[in-house]
């Protein structure tokens, strides 16, 4: 620790620009100040057992997620802290426990891996695999829409993850771009199982809980029983948004968006963006059918359709340069 006058200072590394800067040493743990170099927020680190929390990588209603260093295993992890004022709410507390149990029971490359769940001095925390390269939501915000091949790859991987979820008799119930994160290898990771529940409970109609109305299945809106087909619909809406740059249904009010999911015909993706291939467009139209019975009958069937669309897209992409080259040769011989 260094001192300037009577004020203690602490040297930390800015997570945004990598510069080592001094911040007030008496700053409360997890509090932030602006980096003197780049202006981005720098957080006062906090020690939680063997985990050094270094910076915020996500914020939610239940609490924040921090990038942390495990000083025992010497690896970077993510630590989710539940807001202390929520611990007394049995419903929210159960949601936090539900997320931990659900993720811990699943072992899939594209589902965030849980390392431990514990309590320290009244603070509940969840330690998990680090995926700090942004969400699908942030990618859409940055690029407006993503390349078709990338969207198909994400769709195939998350559909496979959801198939694993279903094989463990679980429904995720909150599929949206913000709940698909990316790690350093650009591998998509499904997160946030706070609303997950057992498939056996699918016939129990309960109050609808949405974080956002843009990807919710019609049967959920109508208070009809949910099934894995509801998760499938939400995945379709998520891919639609990433592919076209537009949510499937948009309107001035939440109520109108909700009604559109039930009553308004979906505009096929290739009518929104003409260069989207027909097989990809057809797959998303089917996965977002109003009637669950008209969607794909299984995740395997959906994955096969996305693989077929991907293969045809690659054929077209490879054929296009050859066509141009052939035209160029023809033009040369006509000279």
Q: What residues fall within each predicted segment?
A:
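Activation segment signature within eukaryotic-like protein kinase domains
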Residues: 154-155
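Protein kinase catalytic-loop region centered on the HRD/HxD motif
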Residues: 160-170
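Conserved short submotifs of the Hanks-type protein kinase catalytic core
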Residues: 121-135, 139
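Activation-segment/catalytic-loop signature of the eukaryotic protein kinase fold
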Residues: 117
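AlphaC helix of the eukaryotic protein kinase fold
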Residues: 83-105
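C-terminal lobe helix-coil module of Hanks-type protein kinase domains
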Residues: 212-318
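Protein kinase glycine-rich loop
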Residues: 54-60, 65
């Amino acid at each position: 620790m260094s001192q300037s006058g009577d004020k203690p200072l602490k040297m930390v590394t800015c997570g945004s620009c990598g510069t080592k800067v001094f911040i007030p040493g008496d700053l409360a743990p997890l509090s932030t100040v602006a980096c003197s170099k780049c202006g981005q927020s720098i957080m006062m680190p906090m020690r939680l057992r063997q985990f050094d929390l270094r910076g915020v990588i996500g914020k939610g209603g239940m609490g924040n997620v921090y990038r942390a260093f495990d000083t025992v295993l010497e690896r970077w992890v993510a630590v989710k802290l539940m807001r202390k004022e929520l611990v007394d709410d049995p419903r929210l507390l159960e949601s936090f426990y539900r997320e931990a149990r659900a993720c811990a029971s699943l072992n899939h490359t594209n589902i965030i891996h849980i390392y431990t769940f514990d309590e320290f001095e009244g603070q509940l925390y969840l330690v998990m695999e680090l995926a700090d390269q942004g969400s699908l939501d942030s990618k859409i915000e940055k690029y407006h829409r993503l390349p078709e091949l990338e969207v198909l790859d994400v769709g195939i991987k998350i559909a496979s993850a959801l198939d694993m979820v279903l094989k463990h008799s679980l429904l995720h119930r909150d599929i949206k771009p913000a709940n698909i994160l990316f790690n350093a290898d650009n591998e998509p990771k499904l997160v946030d199982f706070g609303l997950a529940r057992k498939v056996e409970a699918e016939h129990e109609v309960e109050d609808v809980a949405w974080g956002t109305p843009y990807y919710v299945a019609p049967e959920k809106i109508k208070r009809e029983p949910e099934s894995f087909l509801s998760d499938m619909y939400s995945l379709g809406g998520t891919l639609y948004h990433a592919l076209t740059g537009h949510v499937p249904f948009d309107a001035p009010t939440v109520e109108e968006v909700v009604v559109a999911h039930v009553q308004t015909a979906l505009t096929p993706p290739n009518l929104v963006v003409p260069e989207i291939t027909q097989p990809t467009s057809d797959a998303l139209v089917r996965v977002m059918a109003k009637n669950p019975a008209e969607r794909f009958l299984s995740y395997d069937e959906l994955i096969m359709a996305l693989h077929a669309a991907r293969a045809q897209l690659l054929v077209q992409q490879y054929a296009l340069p050859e066509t141009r080259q052939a035209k160029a040769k023809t033009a040369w011989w006509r000279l």
